C-alpha cells in the first residue's frame, strides 16, 4: 500500500525545499525525500552557510591586522579552532533547525531515505508515478518526519505515489581528470573540515568557491596561490567584477597564476601537494607546492540513468525549457 502525494521532491537542498514550501503554500500534499541526516543540502550543511561562518572569523582577523591603519593598537594572539568549529556547527544547526521547523509547519512530510523511480516520459501528465524508498546507507529503517526533529521509523521499504516528481538531487565536487581527491588534494567539503588553516594552499579554479577559500585563507595568514585558466577570475561573469576581484586579490597578497592548465598533481600522506601546470605562451611544465591543494573547478550533477528520464552527455536531466 503506497501513500499518495500531489508532489514528491527528491532532494532537500535549496531547490528541493523551496519547491516544497511553495507547493505546500498552494495547497498541494508534498513529500520531501532526503538521504542525509539533515535538510538543507550542500548550501546549508557543507557550502554557503559554513563557509560564511569561517569567512566571518577570518574577516575579523583581517580587520585586527589592519587596525593600526586607523590608529588602533590590536593583535591576534591565536585561533582556538575548537571554538571556531563549534561556532560553525552552531550556525549550521540553527539554520537547519529553522528550515526543518518551517517544513513541518507547512505540513510537508520529510522522509530520510534513498529514492528510486522509473519515469515514463511518454505517459500522460496526469499519470501517477511510484517512488520506491529504502533506508539511507547508515540507517536500518526509513525515517518519516511529520514534526521537526521527531523521526518515526517506517520500515525497510516504502512506496510513494505522486502525480508529479521533482528531481532536486544537487551536485558533487568535480575532480581533476586523472587525479581523484586523495591525500592533500581536497574538495570544498573537506576544506571546511580542516583542523587548522594551512600555512600554504594551492587553489585550482576561479569561481565563487575558489575565491571564497582564497580570500578566507589569505586573511588568516596562509600563502595562497590561485591557478586560473583565463586572464581574470570569474571569467564567465561580468568583466568588471572579475577584473576588480583579480586586482583586489593580488593587492591583498594572493598569488594568481593566469592562463594555467593543470596537468597532474603529486600528493601523499604528509607530503602536501605539488601541482604541475603549463601556461599559455610559455614552454615547459611548471609546478607549485602547497600544504593542501583545493580543487574548485565546478560541480557534477547527481543523476542516475535508471530514473528513466533523458540524461545528456554532461549528466544533466534534459528538459524542454
Model-assigned labels for residue ranges:
Residues 2-13, 197-207:
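Beta1/beta-strand and adjacent pyrophosphate-binding region of the FAD-binding site
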Residues 195-237:
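Rossmann-like NAD(P)H-binding beta-loop-alpha module
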Residues 183-197, 292-321:
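FAD-site-proximal beta/loop scaffold in flavoenzymes
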Residues 2-5, 22-28, 34-197, 230-234, ...:
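Glycine-rich flavin
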Residues 162-164, 168-174, 290-303:
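Glycine-/small-residue-rich beta->alpha transition segments that form the dinucleotide
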Residues 27, 221-223, 253:
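Glycine-centered short loops/turns at secondary-structure junctions
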Residues 11, 167-169, 188, 204, ...:
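Short, well-ordered coil/turn residues at beta-beta hairpins
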Residues 6-32, 210-218:
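N-terminal Rossmann-like FAD-binding beta1-loop-alpha1 element of flavoenzymes
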Amino acid at each position: 500500500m503506497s501513500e499518495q502525494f500531489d508532489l514528491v521532491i527528491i532532494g532537500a537542498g535549496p531547490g528541493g525545499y523551496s519547491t516544497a514550501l511553495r507547493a505546500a503554500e498552494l495547497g498541494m500534499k508534498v513529500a520531501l525525500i532526503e538521504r542525509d541526516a539533515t535538510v538543507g543540502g550542500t548550501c546549508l550543511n557543507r557550502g554557503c552557510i559554513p563557509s560564511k561562518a569561517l569567512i566571518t572569523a577570518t574577516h575579523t582577523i583581517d580587520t585586527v591586522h589592519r587596525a593600526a591603519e586607523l590608529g588602533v593598537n590590536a593583535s591576534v594572539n591565536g585561533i582556538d579552532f575548537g571554538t571556531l568549529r563549534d561556532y560553525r556547527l552552531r550556525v549550521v544547526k540553527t539554520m537547519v533547525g529553522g528550515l526543518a521547523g518551517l517544513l513541518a509547519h507547512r505540513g510537508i512530510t520529510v522522509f530520510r531515505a534513498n529514492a528510486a523511480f522509473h519515469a515514463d516520459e511518454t505517459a500522460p501528465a496526469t499519470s501517477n508515478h511510484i517512488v520506491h524508498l529504502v533506508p539511507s546507507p547508515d540507517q536500518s529503517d526509513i525515517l518519516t518526519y511529520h514534526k521537526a526533529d521527531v523521526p518515526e521509523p517506517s520500515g525497510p521499504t516504502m512506496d510513494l505515489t505522486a502525480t508529479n516528481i521533482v528531481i532536486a538531487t544537487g551536485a558533487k565536487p568535480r575532480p581533476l581528470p586523472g587525479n581523484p581527491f586523495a591525500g592533500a588534494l581536497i574538495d570544498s567539503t573537506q576544506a571546511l573540515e580542516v583542523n587548522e588553516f594551512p600555512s600554504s594552499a594551492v587553489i585550482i579554479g576561479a569561481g565563487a568557491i575558489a575565491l571564497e577559500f582564497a580570500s578566507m585563507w589569505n586573511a588568516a595568514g596562509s600563502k595562497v596561490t590561485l591557478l586560473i585558466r583565463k586572464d581574470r577570475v570569474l571569467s564567465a561573469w561580468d568583466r568588471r567584477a572579475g577584473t576588480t576581484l583579480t586586482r583586489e586579490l593580488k593587492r591583498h597578497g594572493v598569488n594568481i597564476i593566469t592562463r594555467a592548465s593543470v596537468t597532474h598533481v603529486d600528493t601523499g600522506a604528509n607530503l602536501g601537494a605539488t601541482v604541475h601546470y603549463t601556461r599559455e605562451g610559455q614552454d615547459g611544465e611548471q609546478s607549485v607546492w602547497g600544504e593542501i591543494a583545493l580543487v574548485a573547478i565546478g560541480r557534477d550533477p547527481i543523476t542516475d540513468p535508471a530514473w528513466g528520464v533523458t540524461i545528456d552527455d554532461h549528466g544533466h536531466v534534459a528538459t524542454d525549457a
